[in-house]
Amino acid sequence: TRTIPVKKYVRIGHSHFRDASEYFRGLQALCDSGADFVDGVVFGPGDFYLTTGTFVDDAPFLSDYTFEHIYYRSIRERSADYLTTHDFLWRWDTDWFWCSKNFGVQNPLLRRLAGKARLNSRTYTKVMRWNSRLKLTQRLGALFGVRHESVIQDVDIPIERAAEFLDFF
């Protein structure tokens, strides 16, 4: 752990991997490298991304994932990106990682109808609590004979066993 000076912008770089063992070796190397930020996303088998973030004073362009554009999609679309430091820290919140699809607000029309102010984890949490009380999705599922249960689980896996866990999972 180290403290580093904050700058106005963050340069983001995304690297794609197809092999889990190479991906986790790359993750370990980046963590050991002293990068300002390291992030990893597994979209599915053979579709792994490592993201590095580096504080910079200037940005040749800025992306905005606070309303119409969706951050997690940009990972596959761009090898490099720039955000303000504030937007970098909150990059996952607009779409509650990728859970916004469960509310239909990845649809551009519904996204505009919801409005920028409602696209955040606070709103999604309120909707989830409301749904839990009213059991709306359970009732719809029962009506159509569909049962769906959401499970979100964080696990701590030693990096040297991570590829093995991913194969199991």
Predicted features by range, described:
Residues 1-169:
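Noncatalytic alpha-helical scaffold of FAD-dependent oxidoreductases
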